[in-house]
Amino acid sequence: MAEICCEVVAGSSSEGKGPECDTGSRAARRRRMEIRRLRVVAERGAEEETSGKRRRLDGGGGEASTDEEDREVERARYGFTSVCGRRRDMEDSVSACPGFLPGHHFFGVFDGHGCSHVATSCGQRMHEIVVDEAGAAAGSAGLDEEARWRGVMERSFARMDAEAVASSRGSVAPAPTCRCEMQLPKCDHVGSTAVVAVLGPRHVVVANCGDSRAVLCRGGAAIPLSCDHKPDRPDELERIHAAGGRVIFWDGARVFGMLAMSRAIGDSYLKPYVICDPEVRVMERKDGEDEFLILASDGLWDVVSNEVACNVVRACLRSSGRRERNRSSPTSNLSPRQSSSSGDEAPNDGAPSAAAGSESDEESAAEEDKACAEAAVLLTKLALARQTSDNVSVVVVNLRRRKL
C-alpha cells in the first residue's frame, strides 16, 4: 500500500507544466491534491481488503458477478421527517439503518396507538431482530430469494410482537418517559403498525402489518408494495369472523368497535383477532426504471393519494438534479487564473481526477440526501394543509443507482 501511495505522489510531482501563475499558490494547491490522492488510494485499498470478507444474503451461495459486487457498495440516499401534527402526543417512530447488513439498508415506519412505547421499541429493535433472523437464514438450502426473505420477515415480526406482549404483561418495564406507567400495570391496549423495507443489491423487500404503507415509483407510475390491513377488507373481515371476532362500524370499521386496523404489533387484548403476521413482497429492482420508495404512516395516506405523493417527490428530486447539473457543468464560471491552475494540477496520470471525482460524488450524495429530506418535509406539509388529524411520518429513499 505504501509503495502505491509513493508512486502516485512521485508520478504526479514530475509531470505537467501549465501557464505561469503564482508559485506559492500552486505549491499549496499541489500539496492539497497530493493529500487527496493519498486518501483516495488508501480508501480503495481498504475496500479491496475487506470486500472478500463481506457476508451477503443475496446470491444463494454462488460466486457474485462483477455487477453484483459493484451493487454491494451502493450508498443509501434517503431523508425522513416525523411530526406530531394536530395530535396531543407523538406516537410514531421512524428507523433508518443504512448498511445494517452488508450491501443492504433498512427503513421502517411505525405508527403507535394507545401510547408510544411499542412503536418506539419497534424503531429501536426491529432492524436488530431482522439481522439475527437473516443470519440464521443465510445457510438455508433449497430456498429461493423470496421464500428466504419471507421467512426472515415473518419470524422477525413474530419476535417483535412477543417482546411487545411481554412488555404489556409486565415482564419488561415500559420506558421511563412512557405515560402508560401512570395507568394500569398491564398496558395491553398499546400497539403499533409496522411497514419496513430492506433495500438490497437486486431486490426491494417490503413487509407490512397495519395501515402504514410503502409505495414504489417505477417508470413514472405509483406502485403500492403493501396493502392496508383494514377490518373491512374482505379477506381480513372473513378471517376475523372465522376467529370469532366482530367488526363494528363506529367511526369507520373497527375490531370490536375499538381498533381501526386488523393487524398490528402488540394489542394483546385483541388477540387472536388482531394478528402480527406481515404481508411480505419481494420486488426485483429494475435499473433505469425504479426512481424512489416512500414509506409513510396513515397520517399521510389518509389525505394524499399514492399518485400525488409520487408526483411531489419526483418534482423535488428533479429540481435537485437540475441544481446539481448547474453546479457541476461549467468551467465557464471559473476565471482564467483558476482554469489554468486546475489544468496544471491535473496531469494525465489519472489520480487527480479520481480525487476530484470522489469529492464531487460526496457533494452530490449529500445533495441527494437533502432532496429526499425536502421531499419528505413537503409531503408532511401537504398532509397538514389537507387537515390530517394524525401524526405524520415519511421516509423517502432514492433508488437511482450511485455506487460508493
From Swiss-Prot:
GO biological process: abscisic acid-activated signaling pathway; regulation of intracellular signal transduction; seed germination; seedling development
Region (Disordered): 42-72, 321-369
Biased amino acid composition, Polar residues: 330-343
Protein name listed in UniProt: Probable protein phosphatase 2C 30
Gene it is expressed from: PP2C30
Any one cellular-component term (Gene Ontology): nucleus
Enzyme Commission number: 3.1.3.16
PPM-type phosphatase domain mapped to chain residues: 77-399
